[in-house]
Amino acid sequence: MAPNGQPLAGFGDRLLAYLIDTAVAMAVMMALFLPVFFLVFFRMIDELEQAGPNGPDPAEVWTSVFLPLLAAELGVLLLMLVFYWVYHVEYARRTGQTLGKKVMKLRIVPVQPDAALSRGMLGKRWAVEFAGGMFVPFLSYLDGFWQLWDKPWQQCLHDKFAGTVVVKVGP
């Protein structure tokens, strides 16, 4: 039981909610990245068609294909971090739920029953789960599996850092 008396969310429910949220994020990412990818891809095909008998000039390929693709990937990465912030902090702040948590009938609540869920708490969750997970190898796995042995609140590392727990709000 959570400090507020609600039942704690189990690993399976949290994993399914995470997978639903990941599907939403992947749909957004594909909508952002595919047009850029096709633009660079067709540009690359055009470069190859214009190449002489010795093949394309490596410097030209580098500057007209690979650098724009790298810049596009960096841009998409930054947009995804912004999307994850909006989705997991701003959107979840209203009810303590993302779309995946709503579907699975889960809610993020503060460990302190008298505290309100704040942008700061959700921002800390985001920092550990997404920003930290980008830079520290295997942190995302360790973070998610942490709840399997955490007692008494079954918290993931991002929950511990933010002072939150995830509870079941429906049958």
Indicate where each model-derived feature is located.
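Transmembrane alpha-helix/helix-exit interface in multi-pass inner-membrane proteins
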Residues: 26-39, 85-88, 92
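Intrinsically disordered, low-complexity Pro/Gly-rich regions
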Residues: 1-4
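Membrane-helix interface segments in multi-pass membrane proteins
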Residues: 30-80
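Short, acidic, Ser/Thr-enriched surface-loop or helix-capping motifs
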Residues: 110-112
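Transmembrane alpha-helical segments in integral membrane proteins
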Residues: 73-94
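Membrane-interfacial segments
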Residues: 36-48, 94-95, 99, 103, ...
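Juxtamembrane cytosolic face of transmembrane helices
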Residues: 6, 10, 16-17, 22, ...
